[in-house]
């Protein structure tokens, strides 16, 4: 995920307390009510008073209250809900309500959303700007590129700038974007460079490969980001650099190199086997948390790229695990679920018991706090629920996800 995940992973892996998912008051801490266990109908109307109360409740401290509010808004007729959400985004006194209203609006497939997101890009509220920029990663509008490129000169928020650069990377066919992002690979703060490097890799930005190879050769905090991005881009000629690094790099970097070479399509079974071995070793042996993070992230990258065996390995090891390994595995699975939702759901549905995997996903969502991406995940799951036949495995899985993750 974005660079913030590294910070979240460090915090999670250094803690011996129960995960956020398991703690009291977190997602899934209380059983769902009987009414929430089945999606009985596509829409449930709200009165104007009920809708106003629900929107106000999006900002409540009580998790159950704000979750119930979001559920009711999502399931109300869009024609009635959208105008109220737009008004709340513009005028509500609570900044967090404005943010959550914008996230929910993103999943309602309304034509007015585009203009609201454009306005959010210039909001004073960092959360709103983050959602505004991130929305256009998946809903591209080339006409906005000059504005977003201009924002690179002024945007300095640690939450907003990664979303901005990721959306620009999604427009990687544009010469102006290529020039701007290539320059950001080798200059600027490491935190922001990490986000740029990851985004370029995810969108297979071969235009930046020479700069990425330069970073990969240097010891430092960005070396693993660059190595993995090189693998994602998929140019087999890069294997010479990766093989050279493999001979000299420290142990903690070896899983990342193995994942990158596998992503190039070279000797993948051997390198994936090494990733599994390093994961098992770091789970069983104290003092190897860097190796643990690298192993899970490597398997996660393979899973996102379409490797079902890598997802299965994470689920197999993650189900019975405990922290610190559990947090690292959950984060890797969360990244796969958000970046390659259809494949993740396919693998999860094939499991004899998907519930341990769903529990891991809930823990990941609590750590990641990727609200917009999680909303996209929910929309995909609920769409799949209604598309699947009644009592089919696909519908049962979707129902369990909706219930457990409290969408």
Per-region residue spans from a language model:
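Intrinsic disorder/low-complexity segments in short proteins, especially the signal peptide
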Residues: 12-13, 18, 26, 304, ...
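Sec-dependent N-terminal signal peptides
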Residues: 1-20
């Amino acid at each position: 995920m974005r660079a913030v995940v590294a910070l979240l992973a460090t915090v999670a892996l250094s803690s011996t307390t129960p995960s956020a998912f398991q703690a009291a008051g977190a997602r899934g801490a209380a059983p769902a009510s009987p009414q929430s266990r089945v999606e009985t109908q596509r829409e449930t109307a709200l009165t104007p008073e009920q809708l106003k109360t629900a929107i106000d409740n999006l900002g409540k401290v009580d998790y159950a209250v704000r979750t119930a509010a979001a559920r009711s808004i999502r399931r109300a007729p869009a024609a009635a809900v959208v105008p109220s959400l737009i008004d709340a985004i513009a005028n509500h006194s609570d900044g967090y309500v404005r943010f959550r209203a914008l996230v929910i609006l993103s999943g309602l497939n309304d034509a007015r959303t585009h203009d609201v997101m454009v306005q959010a890009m210039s909001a004073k509220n960092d959360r709103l700007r983050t959602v505004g920029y991130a929305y256009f990663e998946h809903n591209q509008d080339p006409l906005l590129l000059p504005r977003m490129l201009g924002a690179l000169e002024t945007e300095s928020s640690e939450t907003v700038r990664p979303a901005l650069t990721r959306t620009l990377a999604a427009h990687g066919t544009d010469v102006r974007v290529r020039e701007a992002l290539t320059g950001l690979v080798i200059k600027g703060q490491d935190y922001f460079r990490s986000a740029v490097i990851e985004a370029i890799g995810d969108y297979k930005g071969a235009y930046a490969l020479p700069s990425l190879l330069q970073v990969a050769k240097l010891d430092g905090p960005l070396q693993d980001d660059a190595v993995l991005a090189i693998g994602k881009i998929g140019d087999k000629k890069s294997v010479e650099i990766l093989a050279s690094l493999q001979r000299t790099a420290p142990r903690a970097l070896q899983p990342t190199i193995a994942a990158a070479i596998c992503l190039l399509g070279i000797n993948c079974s051997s390198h994936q086997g090494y990733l599994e071995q390093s994961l098992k070793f770091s789970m069983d042996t104290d003092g190897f948390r860097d190796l643990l993070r690298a192993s899970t992230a490597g398997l996660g990258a393979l899973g996102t790229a379409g490797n079902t065996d890598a997802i299965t390995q994470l689920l197999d090891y993650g189900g019975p695990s405990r922290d610190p390994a559990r947090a690292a595995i959950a984060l890797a699975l969360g990244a796969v679920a958000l970046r390659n939702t259809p494949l993740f759901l396919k693998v999860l549905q094939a499991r004899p018991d998907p519930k341990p995997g769903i529990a891991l996903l809930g823990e990941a969502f609590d750590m990641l706090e990727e609200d917009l991406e999680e909303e996209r995940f929910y929309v995909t799951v609920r769409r799949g629920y209604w598309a699947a036949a009644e009592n089919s495995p696909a519908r049962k899985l979707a129902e369990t996800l909706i219930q457990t993750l409290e969408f």
